[in-house]
UniProtKB/Swiss-Prot annotation:
The active site is at residue 15. Its EC number is 3.1.2.28. This is 1,4-dihydroxy-2-naphthoyl-CoA hydrolase. It catalyses: 1,4-dihydroxy-2-naphthoyl-CoA + H2O = 1,4-dihydroxy-2-naphthoate + CoA + H(+). Belongs to the 4-hydroxybenzoyl-CoA thioesterase family. DHNA-CoA hydrolase subfamily. Pfam families: 4HBT_2. It comes from Trichormus variabilis (strain ATCC 29413 / PCC 7937). Keywords: Hydrolase.
């Protein structure tokens, strides 16, 4: 089951044309990521200031399907998934009412903050990822039963 984050588009999110500036949609997605961590019980202060471990974003992409304007009320739906022993990916869908207006992906790699070398994901992040994996699997099982 995706995590949902509600957000109002602010004037500061927009560019001279009055639409959301392309890079700001990633910041808005990151807000959703942070909210999902916080909701699962992860201390953001400890997570982002851990002197031994960091989770840099090594890939990001966005597809814009419709423009967003100041005052728009959006819902960010995100699903994180483990894609290796040391990395995970988050898929985001941004909705205005029931209309999909943008899609984004961020890929994160777990590194030792001192040596900058890859390391396995922390137990805390694995538990966060597993929570979404289990919820998603349960939703898929329910859908499969409905089809039968």
């Amino acid at each position: 089951m995706p995590f949902t984050y509600h957000r109002t588009i602010h004037f500061q999110d927009t560019d001279a044309a009055g639409v959301v500036y392309f890079a700001n949609i990633l910041s808005i997605c990151h807000e959703g990521y942070e909210a999902s961590l916080r909701t699962s019980g992860i201390s953001l202060k400890e997570f982002f200031t851990n002197p031994n471990m960091a989770f840099p974003i090594v890939h990001a992409s966005v597809d814009f399907l419709r423009p967003l304007f100041c005052g728009d009320q959006v819902i960010i739906s995100l699903v994180p998934q483990k894609i290796g022993a040391e990395k995970f990916e988050i898929n985001y869908e941004i909705y205005l009412a029931d209309v999909l207006v943008a899609k984004a992906v961020t890929r994160h790699v777990c590194i030792d903050a001192n040596t900058r070398s890859k390391q396995e994901l922390s137990t805390e992040i694995i538990q966060w990822l597993d929570g979404y994996r289990k919820e998603t699997e349960e939703v898929e099982r329910r859908k499969a039963r409905e089809v039968v």
